[in-house]
Amino acid sequence: MDNEDKVSFPAKEEKVLTFWKEQNIFQKTLENRDGSPTFSFYDGPPFATGLPHYGHLLAGTIKDVVCRYATMDGHYVPRRFGWDCHGVPVEYEVEKSLGLTEPGAIDRFGIANFNEECRKIVFRYVDEWKYFVDRIGRWVDFSATWKTMDLSFMESVWWVFHSLYKQGLVYEGTKVVPFSTKLGTPLSNFEAGQNYKEVDDPSVVAKFALQDDQGILLAWTTTPWTLVSNMALAVHPGLTYVRIQDKESGEEYILGQESLARWFPDRESYKWIGQLSGESLVGRRYCPLFPYFQDQQDRGAFRVIPADFIEESEGTGVVHMAPAFGEADFFACQEHNVPLVCPVDNQGCFTSEVTDFVGEYIKFADKGIARRLKNENKLFYQGTIRHRYPFCWRTDSPLIYKAVNSWFVSVEKVKHKMLKANESIHWTPGHIKHGRFGKWLEGARDWAISRNRYWGTPIPIWRSEDGELLVIRSIQELEELSGQKIVDLHRHFIDEIVIHKNGKSFHRIPYVFDCWFDSGAMPYAQNHYPFERAEETEARFPADFIAEGLDQTRGWFYTLTVIAAALFDQPAFKNVIVNGIVLAEDGNKMSKRLNNYPSPKKIMDTYGADALRLYLLNSVVVKAEDLRFSDKGVEAVLKQVLLPLSNALAFYKTYAELYGFSPNETTDLELAEIDRWILSSLYSLVGKTRENMAQYDLHAAVSPFIDFIEDLTNWYIRRSRRRFWESEDSPDRRAAFATLYEVLMVFSKIIAPFIPFTAEDMYQQLRVETDPESVHLCDFPHVVLEKILPDLEKKMQDIREIVALGHSLRKEHKLKVRQPLQHMYIVGAKERMAALAQVDSLIGEELNVKEVHFCSETPEYVTTLVKPNFRSLGKRVGNRLPEIQKALAGLSQEQIQAFMHNGFMVLSLGEETISLNEEDITVSWEAAPGFVARSSASFVAILDCQLTSPLIMEGIAREIVNKINTMRRNGKLHVSDRIAIRLHAPKIVQEAFSQYEEYICEETLTTSVSFIDDKEGEEWDVNGHAVSLSLEVIGH
């Protein structure tokens, strides 16, 4: 592809951007639909602390397509942009930049100072975001952005929380939750599910000696650091356990019977003592592994408890319980009154109780703990295991599960409402509804919403010393209770506010909300609901449409659903498109460090935004599957789709200007069949696009219009070219111009939501003064039923299928299309052959064949062969396949033709018969010498490849035409330039030229020909003959 072509597309897009901006087109589209039905759209807010990447551009493109389409379809579509400002992503950037990485560093720096630093960097990359949003062609309203750190937004978040609290859906409790030691704060379950990795961890089996006899319980774990906090062992009361004696050590071990072979594969290595039930082990006491919490024995620690969740598929059938560090452990121990100890601080280091490992990071302590157990003969096995483990989504550090005091939303109480809400949501792709999202809802657990962090919306709870709570609903309420003017709701403005009421002093609890709570409250908080714009907010709820990546099924989609179902018993959105992840070309995650992907700016500067948009939209990534990004793929879209479309427009413009065609001259024209076909295809495309957009299926909407560009450029224009070239004005030429104008104009509107730059550029070159100012101010086209001709579309599809077969045969057997052939035979259904016989000349012209014959039976030049389809028949007939193969080989051509006509046959196998259908039999064709054959689903095509002298001479003439016109193109001659040529060639080429001189001159606008003795100009190979050609422009 010429570099000039690539450069022209980005340059055109920059001109379109300038036009949109100078003419305020986006604002005009809003004004144009003011008063029309509103299409409600919620935009998932990004953080501006990082640069936008392909994932953002993908989601932004999807949103833009749907919103542009809804606008053109007659809706008012407000598109407010929002910014996520709170939470770990911002805090983490400030911590790194200021070196506040040690425990207590932020408190020493000062919460006020830290929060103001957070406020400063929130919009670090806002200009870059605006650039990329504009450059990708996305229209959003940056003049009315909302921010999660705005006072109005935060007040609405308080209202949401207060409403949940009033319904009894908020409580304080201690639970084991995912915990980031790097951040020093708990995370929600859905955050913990966002970043799993395959890692190698320790795998150890510890020995727990019973107190009342010499038996030793074996328990397996992949977290040796939790053994320090062991408070109980659990067994399944319904399982069978065994007691054996290890012959080498003499020790007696107790473990699950089903796990015995896993740990003792050598039957001779132990002595069998006996079986015992899990129930009989319950209540037995054992010796603690470590001395740190021996005093807990009097409170119920270090005994065996029952647990039904234990399985023997892994481990030993005995489970070590550290109730502070495992959710199942926590509930089981709580049920059986086992105490809880938590000797790990928020940074993941052992506290002073663990004297031998105090201050050591728990994961680093694994080896030391295992070594100590080994030295004290308390370690049965030590190894490693590869498994999936959760990592912090922001810091990429391992998470732990830790018992913390937190505030929770009672999600499990409203789970039934969430599941009901999901039933009314239209998901694209559909499998996510009851798959990834539905299953996540079914397993939803209470949401830990409090974070012991700094930069976030403070939880509006004030508590007195005796535990009474004041849950504040609004700024006005806080001002009335505190007597202070409130100008900001962040921690450093309100933490010191003390409320005095009924003789008590109330102090705020030291937590902020999980920033996902902010995001989930966005439908209300963006409008300061219910304090302002209540009617508007309620009218636009739920959203008609949202879109984000697959990870948001456990993020924003989820939190939106939790809050909307809890507050209003409704979904937060009606329709959602879920996209997959854009990976680097090597299949790995895109990484700046690895430099394994091209920058989005480079791609758009090289190929243009529309090429990138279309590449993404026409890929599996819009169906929630992963895409390996390839700049070659973007280039292919430009070369194979956008450039041909641009050439089609240039073709129309060139000849319309040359012959002075006006779009107003389009009445009372008699259209050719090919005109009626392309118009029928056009309005069928309108219908398909509308149907697919109604289902929010962007991939299905894009694919047909890409196919249509092929129909338009490689069939309609190519087949109609001579009609446009006619020098004399005629009704047929006017019909061709009128048809092509209508197609290009309507098509510019069809593609406008998807590739808005290309559409605008086309439209501006086609529009007349009375047309709307921009394609994006037009209505989306409607189906014109009287122009849709299904039978004609089917016939043309058959013709193109036959032509494709013919081209494949020529390519396979190295027969240039410029070389004419005498005969072609088409075999197919009788009723289709009759219709196609009327267009034999069209097929003949396209394939350069003199005579096209249509047959309902295979001609004598071809033998039809049938063989069993082993995949289809294998399971059904088993070892009788050879018999069937032999019987099929013995069929006559008449019998095979009968099978092809009927679609089934009854085959005799000795005294038995078997019925076979088309799926059971593979059909192929064997052509006689001089003939070649190929089949499609509907037809068999046979070419007569025998070349006579007249055919050879015509082939040379056509080859000469090709070489001359190639020279015209390379020399950038105008389409009307007349030329003189000088030709040096062998006798056969000269004879061919003389024989076809009129044809050659007409096709190349040649007015003078000279045969010369010496080589001159460019040298060419003309069907194996060396030829030199030179040309000169001699007129117009």
Swiss-Prot record:
Gene field: ileS
Gene Ontology annotations of biological process type: isoleucyl-tRNA aminoacylation
Gene3D superfamilies xrefs: HUPs, Isoleucyl-tRNA Synthetase, Domain 1, Valyl/Leucyl/Isoleucyl-tRNA synthetase, editing domain
Comment field on protein domains: IleRS has two distinct active sites: one for aminoacylation and one for editing. The misactivated valine is translocated from the active site to the editing site, which sterically excludes the correctly activated isoleucine. The single editing site contains two valyl binding pockets, one specific for each substrate (Val-AMP or Val-tRNA(Ile)).
Task of the protein: Catalyzes the attachment of isoleucine to tRNA(Ile). As IleRS can inadvertently accommodate and process structurally similar amino acids such as valine, to avoid such errors it has two additional distinct tRNA(Ile)-dependent editing activities. One activity is designated as 'pretransfer' editing and involves the hydrolysis of activated Val-AMP. The other activity is designated 'posttransfer' editing and involves deacylation of mischarged Val-tRNA(Ile).
Cellular localization per UniProt: Cytoplasm
Short motif 'HIGH' region, span: 46-56
GO molecular function, one term: tRNA binding
Protein name: Isoleucine--tRNA ligase
